[in-house]
């Protein structure tokens, strides 16, 4: 499902990730843990497509090299960052926002979109 091999990431001449590797098979759950500055956020940023990093290595998700596809395509595959405490957007209902996001991913995967009752 997710295979990362020899992933290195550098920003502003500082190497953060050095030959990182990880394999997550379908059904497995993993936690990325470590002290401040160990590269957890950098890993998430690189996988989700944040710009500004010099990247070497490979990161395959469901057979697709994430590092070769645009941010929008990564998000459609479900690879994106979300804020733990998102800001409120006036006039935007949180449930509707989440349903729209989920349905965009479902549509990309060829699945039927959920109506409001199915979503809840």
Residue map of PLM features:
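The feature captures the beta-strand-to-loop junction immediately N-terminal to the Walker
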Residues: 33-35
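ABC-family P-loop ATPase nucleotide-binding domains
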Residues: 87-120
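Short coil-to-beta microelement around the adenine-binding A-loop and adjacent beta1/P-loop entry
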Residues: 14-15, 73
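Conserved structural motif at the start of ABC-family nucleotide-binding domains
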Residues: 2-4, 17-19
């Amino acid at each position: 499902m997710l295979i990362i091999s020899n992933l290195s990431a550098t920003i502003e001449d500082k190497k953060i990730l050095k030959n990182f590797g990880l394999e997550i098979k379908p059904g497995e759950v993993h936690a990325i843990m470590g002290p401040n500055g160990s590269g957890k956020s950098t890993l998430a940023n690189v996988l989700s497509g944040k710009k500004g990093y010099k990247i070497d290595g490979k990161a395959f998700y469901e057979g697709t090299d994430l590092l070769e596809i645009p941010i929008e395509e990564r998000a459609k595959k479900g690879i994106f960052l979300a804020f733990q405490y998102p800001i409120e957007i006036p006039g935007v209902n949180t449930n509707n926002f989440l349903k729209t996001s989920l349905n965009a991913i479902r549509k990309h995967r060829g699945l039927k979109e959920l109506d409001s009752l199915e979503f809840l």
